[in-house]
Structures are given as C-alpha cells and as structure tokens.
Design a protein with these regions (language model features):
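TRNA-recognition modules of translation machinery and tRNA-sensing kinases, especially anticodon-binding
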Residues: 1-157
Length: 157
C-alpha cells in the first residue's frame, strides 16, 4: 500500500456536509451583497506565473508560496493572493472597459504556513476590488461592504 494514499498533506483537509453547507451559505450571502452593489464575479486561474507575485512591494513571502515548474521550465505558483491576479486580469482583459470596474471573487488561496497552529494552507477567500475610482466615496463603499460581510459572518449567515 502507498504510504500517503489515505491521508491529506499537512495544512490541508477534507470538508464534509455541514461545513460545505456553511461555506455555501456564507458565499451566497456575500455574493448577494456584492451583486446588489454592482460587483461582477470573476475567477482567476488557481495556477499563476510566479512573476505575478514576485515584486518587492507585494507583501508576499516567496518561501510561503507553493511553486511548480511547468513543462517549459517556467515557475508557476498556486494562487497565494487574489488581488494581484485580478489586477493582472484588469490590465490584460478589461483595459478597454469603462472604469471604475467592480469585481468580486469567491476562491481559494494557497500559502504555506510555517507554523500550522491549526490553520490550513488552503484558505477560502471572498472579496471585492473596486478599480479605477480613487474617491473617498469608493473607499467608504469598500469598507462598508467589508463590514457588512463581516457582520453577516458573525451572525452565522
């Protein structure tokens, strides 16, 4: 028998029944909140080029990323953050669209945790990006939606 055929790697876990239902309820509540405020859903690839995240000001530790090499020798990573891939998407796919652009996502990020302390390396994230509006009203909207989303989570939605 293979040694690791029946276990998950450290930092990962299976989700069953109630946990799946809870996650879906939260995601649906947040999706409703985002869409009611004019945000549109995007999904970025789970696998991105390392270069997307390899800038000194990104605030990401390269040692905490899951790195892979593709069949052409290029370094790729499992998505450790959602904001940078969305910035890439806007710059490459939506640059001709009218701004501001309101986007949301519900997808996992993958970061190696040096000390697991009960945390997993795959974390479900939900969030919004308001791109192209530097006004205070835009900042207030983003903060208000984040606060509303957190209240929904605390309320058990």
């Amino acid at each position: 028998m293979k040694q690791y055929a029946k276990v998950t790697p450290e930092g990962s876990r299976d989700l069953l029944f109630e946990e799946c239902d809870d996650r879906r309820r939260v995601e649906n509540a947040l999706t409703g909140l985002y869409e009611a405020n004019g945000y549109r859903k995007v999904i970025t690839p789970t696998l991105e080029f390392f270069d997307v995240f390899n800038s000194g000001d990104a605030g990401l530790d390269a040692d905490e990323m899951y790195k892979l090499t593709d069949n052409r020798g290029r370094t790729t990573v499992l998505r450790p953050d959602n904001t940078l891939p969305i910035a890439r998407l806007v710059a490459t796919r939506l640059s001709e669209d009218a701004f501001p652009v309101r986007l949301y996502y519900n997808q996992s990020v993958f970061v190696r945790t040096k000390e697991l302390a009960g945390r997993t390396d795959e974390v479900a994230q939900s969030g919004i990006e308001l791109i192209g509006d530097g006004s205070m009203a835009a900042d207030i909207q983003v903060i208000t939606l984040a606060f509303s989303g957190a209240l929904n989570r605390v309320a058990g939605v």
